[in-house]
Amino acid sequence: MKMIEVVAAIIERDGKILLAQRPAQSDQAGLWEFAGGKVEPDESQRQALVRELREELGIEATVGEYVASHQREVSGRIIHLHAWHVPDFHGTLQAHEHQALVWCSPEEALQYPLAPADIPLLEAFMALRAARPAD
């Protein structure tokens, strides 16, 4: 079975995270997800994330700590999804590949119809965040 490596960005600003709505003509249309995409053979996960966020959102991202990985089978392929925290970026967000973008708290994000693969990543991020010492 083919394995596909995918990276996802949990972009955080002022305590809120960014969700992106999948386009109407896509697989899992209308569901909300973390921006990201496939890792090319010649790049690291961090490099892939910076490239994907530039392509999808028009931003230059600062990739922070690794959050979690999740694996699931989709259409006869194994998708290995890796989430990274993005605590900072430069540029103005633009939805190049998504229907809509929304900022919300991680708790509010659970109320959105999320892409199933992103739910365990959000939960892992919330657990990490809860364990962080207060500034």
From Swiss-Prot:
Optimum pH is 8.5-9. One of its GO terms (biological process) is DNA repair. Its cofactor is Mg(2+); Mn(2+). Its EC number is 3.6.1.65. The keyword Magnesium applies. It holds the Pfam family NUDIX. One of its GO terms (molecular function) is 8-oxo-7,8-dihydrodeoxyguanosine triphosphate pyrophosphatase activity. Hydrolase with a preference for pyrimidine substrates. Has high activity with 5-methyl-dCTP, and much lower activity with CTP, dCTP, 5-hydroxy-dCTP, 2-hydroxy-dATP and 8-hydroxy-dGTP. PANTHER family: 8-OXO-DGTP DIPHOSPHATASE, CTP PYROPHOSPHOHYDROLASE. Monomer. This is CTP pyrophosphohydrolase.
